[in-house]
Amino acid sequence: MQLSTFSHSEEELLEKANWLAGFTLGEIAHQLNIDVPLDLRRDKGWVGQLIETALGAKAGSKPEQDFAHLGIELKTIPINHKGFPLETTFVSLAPLTQNIGITWQTSHVRHKLQKVLWIPVQGERHIPVAERHIGQPILWAPSCEQEQQLKNDWEELMEYIIFGRLNEINATLGEVLQLRPKGRNSRSLTAAVNQQGERVQSLPLGFYLRKQFTAEILQNFLRSPL
């Protein structure tokens, strides 16, 4: 299989993703001449970048989808031995300014989640990074019920942002979607607006999918007939 190449169709992309399943991260990294870190403490995004490279994804963390020509976003998801997600999933940065008039239909979150290629990867820390196996890919689009859940949370969370109630935002808000600081450190500040409508500095905020939501996606795939 020729990796790191352009996929002209959804079928071609899925063929590559299915081929990856069962290999270890070390085996794929070796094929791509990429060094494997001893651990992920300083290389948190390494697994995602490796899979992106292997599948020829281009967008990275840009607002567009990883495979924009196919309308597909790529997400690696670390799982434990029971197949349960080990962490929340970053979707996109929240617009802290110039957000008047944005609706769910036009939001980056909806755009990114219209169709997602999930790649489960062993993520338990006792397994050396190079020996972690890649799982079966899941091509997913939200059901009507899931989209309604996402929409409800997004609208609630955006209300806090638009009305400048940034100090009230915490990770407990939202049933399936949450807002959390997204920055390398506490000095990574960006422009925002407070309740008085004044420009202030704030930590960048990102939209994240809760583990229970992504667990449901994985479980639905396992239960679905082949």
From Swiss-Prot:
Its cellular-component GO annotations read:
cytoplasm
Protein location: Cytoplasm
GO MF terms, alphabetically ordered: DNA binding; endonuclease activity
Alphabetically list the UniProt keywords: Cytoplasm, DNA damage, DNA repair, Endonuclease, Hydrolase, Nuclease
Q: Between which residues do disulfide bridges form?
A: none
**Any stretches that span the bilayer, and where are they?**
none
* Protein family according to the UniProt entry: Belongs to the MutH family.
- GO BP annotations listed: DNA modification; mismatch repair
Q: What is this protein called?
A: DNA mismatch repair protein MutH
The protein's matches in SUPFAM superfamilies, at most eight in alphabetical order, are given as:
Restriction endonuclease-like (SSF52980)
- Asked whether the keyword Nuclease is assigned, the reply is yes
What are the top taxonomic ranks of the organism? Bacteria, Pseudomonadati, Pseudomonadota, Gammaproteobacteria, Pasteurellales
- Tell me if Metal-binding is a UniProt keyword of this record: no
Give one Pfam family, short name only.
MutH
- Report the protein's function: Sequence-specific endonuclease that cleaves unmethylated GATC sequences. It is involved in DNA mismatch repair.
List the InterPro entries: DNA_mismatch_repair_MutH, DNA_rep_MutH/RE_typeII_Sau3AI, DNA_rep_MutH/T2_RE_sf, Restrct_endonuc-II-like
